[in-house]
UniProtKB/Swiss-Prot annotation:
Assigned protein family: Belongs to the helicase family.
Disruption phenotype: When this gene is missing the DISARM system does not confer Nf, phi3T or SPO1 resistance in B.subtilis.
Keywords: Antiviral defense, ATP-binding, Cytoplasm, Helicase, Hydrolase, Nucleotide-binding, Restriction system
UniProt-listed InterPro entries: Helicase_C-like, P-loop_NTPase
Protein name: DISARM protein DrmA
GO molecular function terms noted in the UniProt entry: ATP binding; helicase activity; hydrolase activity
Gene: drmA
Length: 1119
């Protein structure tokens, strides 16, 4: 995009903000204003009302919050609705209580809080506001007399002498308006905390006599920078994060308003100004390398993926990679450490950067090894795959006029330096199974939309190729096949979109394998391991039976599966062919599902698309990469087949596939028979990737940290006396205290963030802030209106933004730049609040748009017709359709409005979106960053945050709007998880004990083998748990081991006394009702009369719920 185009998008955005301010506040002071409606109705913010002015509530206090009970979810809802609801209800429950006033109180004052040195004598206060007077006029159009309101601007200037009072002073401006000033000296400093208030003291119940478009500006009479930054004024705030953000100072905060400023330096500002709709634009990050005088400008295409893939000269590739490392080293050496006062922080920065450089160089050395060039061959394979998947992406856009082979011959893609560096620093940990680097959890921390996914997909491609090159060298394990990588997410929307990216990469792997006849005999494939509400868990669920599956239900399951992969990852063709093997007949027992492209010229019309969607097939086919939501691992204690995911197989059936150790297998297959032969176990998963790490926190992180004990142990290879654990990689755009969280959840003491920060947050070498004048990015604006309900505020904002884009379509020049702002994304913290907006869209917003058309004489009105939701109420099968609709540009049935909850805060990558309205400050800053980052990814974005003035937390963020937004990542809250705490152990300790034993020992695998526990040596289990707890929380070791022993004793006791003990049976089956069965485990949702320890079947059920019954007719006088 050219600079001229960026300026045009910026111009459209500026018009939208200006229109919003005009409608909510009124015109600027240098414009005239004559209106036909009362000013108190025309404008809703920027107003200081007379003291006794009030308005009645429009409905009730609940109306402020949209406190309507949301509808029940539709049938067929997926299992993660519970987690989504829990999150949304938790948001509602934890919000600050709103003062239960019977009336909305109007604001009658505003203020600015700032810091000045003791030597500052005067502050100049400039005050201005609009005063409206009414008059009558005959309207020839309406043929009647109308009332006109005309504005007059009142301006005053007052010099505040700080030495003339001790603590407080009241300075009259007029008979009805005054300045109230207070000052307080900070202990042990020469700094005063000064607060200046503008107060409307008029007593009048007529709100039209208010002060409109109020402004308060503080300066020095000589224009000096006298306002001290908070970090300098309050020395107690000097932590490492403050050090990094020292060039983004906070100079003031507001009272009842926000504050903007003009800064002379990083320590002093020369002007502070009140703002009722404050704005702040955040910078985008450039991944281009800085110019280096020793190495010059990096040529375009220098890190060409195609050139790396085709390189025959190993030395040439190594030279390019060394050039990257040399530039980084040069940058580190030139950091101006002598000019930075905080030496402790400086030493930390240099140490972290040097450690990263050392690991990058070790990765390059591995690739430079000419005697053992397998790493270099795998590196070329990685580049071939990444180039091919990009060619597939381009082929998908226009498969009518080009071919995949044609696109492969083109050179379009190159590595971003940070992506290549991250791959290089991870190579040793992937190649050398005994390397110390394998113990490090590498955290890829990069802003949303920066290319994190491509970086770790490159690592995946390298490992897949490298593992196959060593397929014949292992005696204990088979490496040609088996699950190599576990890729985990938390939310289903994220998993759906990332699955599609991964599927294209894996398709490129398989395309390359088949074209080169190298890299093993087993296919490269991906398994989508998610809940039963997304796809069936068993193939039997695709066949009619006499109990509960009739033809209609089976056909619905067919339809659900067919909605998962919508288009071919290679050519983009839609309407794929799903082959239900051996036939589509609903009465035929299914043996598998294969998906083919219907485009005859596509590679995957001859061979199936390498993806598996049904749990049973995943256990049998063992796809190379398994992508799942984290909660799916709660299935481990329930199903012995899950052992196969960790390579624990010992048989192969020609019809079914791989069979887990200890698993019961039917030999007959009814007819004809299939042969079964013994096989070596596969090497367990070598890499575990956790995307959006910041979401693994709180109750979910606590429980998941317990299950991670099992996952890491089952992914550990035992070769002789060596215990070779898997490599962990995590990625996030928002996290704080990552080292603590990684230790609690993953049990790893070492965490390394990449890229490590430099001496300032603006520049880490691999990522540098861009200049806003040249690269406009994402503009935030805040609205906080007292005296009106949130309903009123929201409908006014939505109406203005929607109508403005319609009006601008008539501008021949600007109409080409409307598309990013044509679809409004409405973000809500709960379904309850969203429900109120749904009703507004149906009626009130439409009426307000009509009003705007008449008021501002627009020639056309915006009509709202396409307005879907993205919430937990939407079934997974419908989500891809909504995402597809979001991609549609203006004039192509584009969506008008999309209402969403925190489901979209990660993973919704739609580049065209540029407009969002966030209702209420999200509970966490990380969620605020993630959600607002859904817009403005490719074009300058606009985010309007609507604050609730009756929530103290919202007001706090609004009053510190500029300070908060200019250092957003600084305010990210630390994440927490407490595995092995007492209550957490109640939830999962018995489950991980069952999972470890059942999946490690064939004698305990089958459902009826639960009774065999009495014959087992349990020291292995105890050692694993003890080591884990010692790492995670040493203080809980004794209690945990006692807790574990209690459960094992109970299990053994039952195994001795109950011959029919099994892990689980469904109490609703006929055999369970008439038989004498006993079970070890029970689902949380089941009745407890059948016994069994309540056990999680999904991590969506982490927190319990209670039912509340209200009996009508109860009379307290009867007590």
């Amino acid at each position: 995009m050219s600079k001229a185009e960026r300026e045009m998008y910026k111009k459209v955005r500026r018009i939208m903000v200006s229109d919003l301010k005009r409608d909510l506040i009124g015109p600027a002071h240098d414009e005239s204003d004559v209106i036909y409606e009362a000013p108190s109705q025309a404008y809703i913010t920027g107003i200081l009302y007379p003291l006794e002015s009030e308005v009645e509530t429009e409905k009730s206090l609940e109306d402020v919050q949209f406190a309507d009970v949301y509808d029940e979810p539709e049938s067929g809802m997926e299992e993660d609705v519970e987690q989504q609801r829990n999150s949304e209800l938790e948001q509602e429950a934890e919000e600050e209580k709103i003062t239960p006033n019977k009336k909305f109180k109007h604001q009658n004052s505003l203020g600015i809080r700032c810091y000045v040195r003791e030597t500052t004598d005067h502050i100049r206060a400039s005050i201005a506001w609009g005063r409206y007077t009414s008059s009558k006029k005959f309207d020839s159009e309406r043929k009647r007399e109308v009332i006109l309101w005309t504005r007059q601007i009142e301006c005053f200037e007052e010099y505040i002498s700080l030495s003339s009072f001790d603590q407080n002073i009241d300075i009259p401006i007029t008979q009805e308006v005054s300045l109230v000033v207070s000052k307080k000296k900070l202990s042990g400093t020469d700094v005063f905390l000064v607060s200046v208030f503008l107060v409307n003291k008029r007593v009048d119940k007529n709100s039209n006599n208010a002060m409109f478009q109020c402004e308060l500006t503080l300066t020095h009479e000589e224009g000096k920078g006298i306002f001290l930054c908070e970090n300098e004024a309050r020395k107690d705030k000097n932590d490492f994060s403050e050090f990094l953000y020292r060039n983004k100072p906070v100079f003031a905060k507001g009272f009842g308003c926000a504050v903007t400023w003009k800064a002379e330096s990083s320590n002093y500002a020369s002007e502070l100004k009140s703002a009722f709709i404050p704005e702040h634009e955040v910078e985008s990050m450039s991944t281009d390398l800085p110019y280096d005088e020793n190495y010059g400008e990096l040529p375009k295409g220098y890190f060409s993926i195609k050139q790396f893939a085709e390189a025959d000269d190993q030395r040439e590739t190594i030279d390019k990679l060394n050039n990257l490392a040399n530039r980084y080293e040069s940058w580190i050496n030139k950091l101006p450490v002598d000019k930075v006062a905080n030496k402790e922080a400086t030493e930390r920065v240099i140490k972290d950067c040097q450690a990263t450089l050392t690991r990058i160089r070790r990765g390059i050395q591995l690739l430079a090894n000419e005697e053992n060039n397998k790493a270099f061959v795998a590196f070329k394979f990685m580049n071939t795959v990444m180039h091919t998947q990009d060619a597939m992406k381009r082929y998908s856009r226009n498969n009518k006029t080009t071919t995949l082979e044609t696109e492969i011959r083109k050179e379009n893609l190159e590595w971003r330096p940070f992506q290549l560096a991250f791959i290089l620093l991870n190579l040793e940990g992937l190649v050398d199974l005994k390397s110390k680097d394998r113990k490090i959890v590498d955290l890829l921390w990069f802003p949303t939309g920066g290319g994190k996914t491509e970086a770790y997909l490159g690592i995946c491609a390298f490992l897949l190729g490298y593992r196959r090159l060593f397929a014949s060298t292992s005696s204990a394990y088979e490496r040609d096949g088996g699950v190599t990588i576990l890729l985990r997410y938390t939310l289903r929307l994220l998993t759906t979109q990332q699955r599609d990216r991964l599927m294209r990469m894996i398709s490129a792997c398989e395309y390359t394998r088949q074209k080169t006849n190298a890299f093993g005999q087993s296919e490269f494939s991906v398994g989508f391991w998610v809940g039963a509400q997304v796809t069936v868990n068993k193939l039997d669920d695709l066949t009619e039976n006499e109990y509960y599956l009739d033809r209609d239900k089976v056909l619905k399951e067919y339809e659900k599966i067919e909605k998962q992969v919508i288009e071919c990852p290679c050519c983009g063709t839609k309407g794929l062919e799903y082959k239900f093997l051996p036939s589509r007949d609903t009465k035929t027992k299914k043996t598998g599902i294969k998906i083919f492209c219907t485009n005859e010229s596509c590679f995957f019309s001859k061979t199936h698309i390498p993806v598996y969607l049904v749990d049973e097939e995943i256990y049998r086919k063992l796809p190379t990469v398994v992508i799942s939501t984290v909660d799916k691992f709660a299935r481990l204690p329930w199903d012995e087949k899950t052992a196969a995911l960790f390579g624990k197989v010992n048989r192969f059936c020609e019809r079914c596939g791989y069979i887990a150790e200890g698993e019961k297998h039917e030999k007959s297959h009814r007819n004809p028979k299939a042969s079964v032969h013994d096989v070596k176990p596969f090497y367990p998963p070598e890499l575990i990737i956790q995307d959006e790490l910041h979401l693994i926190t709180g109750p979910l992180g606590t429980v998941y940290g317990g299950y991670e004990t099992v996952i890491e142990e089952l992914s550990t290879a035992h070769e002789g006396e060596d215990y070779l654990k898997p490599k962990y990689i995590a990625a996030t755009a928002t996290i704080k205290n990552a080292e603590v969280q990684v230790e609690k959840v993953f049990g790893r003491k070492l965490t390394q963030q990449f890229p490590p920060p430099g001496l300032k947050v603006e520049d880490s070498f691999f990522a540098r802030e861009r200049n806003l004048d040249e690269f406009p990015f994402r503009l935030y604006a805040g609205v906080c209106v007292s005296g009106h309900s949130m309903k009123t505020v929201l409908l006014r904002i939505y109406a203005v933004l929607l109508q403005t884009t319609e009006h601008l379509l008539e501008d021949e020049e600007l109409s080409k730049y409307i598309d990013p702002y044509r679809t409004l994304v409405g973000y809500f913290n709960s379904i309850r609040e969203l429900g109120g907006a749904v009703r507004l869209l149906e009626d009130d917003i439409k009426k307000r748009i009509q009003t705007l058309q008449k008021k501002y004489k627009y020639s056309k009105q915006r009509y709202i017709s396409r307005k879907p939701e993205l919430t937990s109420r939407v079934p997974s099968s419908r989500i891809p359709k909504v995402l597809e609709q979001l991609e549609k540009e203006i004039g192509n049935e584009e969506l008008d409005v999309v209402l969403a909850t925190n489901m979209i805060s990660v993973g919704m990558d739609v580049d065209r979106l540029g407009l969002m309205v966030i209702t209420g400050q999200p509970k966490q800053t990380s969620e605020y960053i993630q959600s607002s980052s859904r817009v403005g990814r490719s074009k300058p974005g606009l985010v309007i945050t609507v604050y609730n003035p009756y929530r103290p937390r919202d007001m706090s963020h609004y009053q510190n709007f500029k300070g908060y937004h200019q250092r957003l990542y600084h305010f990210v809250e630390g994440t927490t998880a407490t595995p092995y705490a007492s209550r957490a152990r109640d939830r999962f300790l018995h489950a991980i004990a069952v999972a470890l034993l059942r999946l490690s020992y064939p004698e305990l695998a089958k459902n009826l083998d639960a009774k065999n526990i009495k014959d087992m040596d349990l020291n292995y289990l105890k050692d694993v748990v003890k080591k884990r707890v010692s790492t995670v929380e040493y203080r809980n070791v004794s209690d945990t081991m006692e807790h574990l022993q209690h459960f094992l004793d109970e299990w053994i006791s039952r195994a001795v006394s109950e011959d029919n003990l099994q892990y689980y049976f469904n109490p609703k089956t006929r055999s369970a009702r008439i038989g004498n069965q006993s079970r070890l485990l029970a689902r949380f949702s089941e009745e407890k009369k059948h016994g069994g320890k309540p056990t999680l079947d999904s991590m969506r059920q982490v927190e319990g719920t209670s039912s509340l019954y209200i009996y009508e007719g109860w009379n307290s006088s009867e007590e």
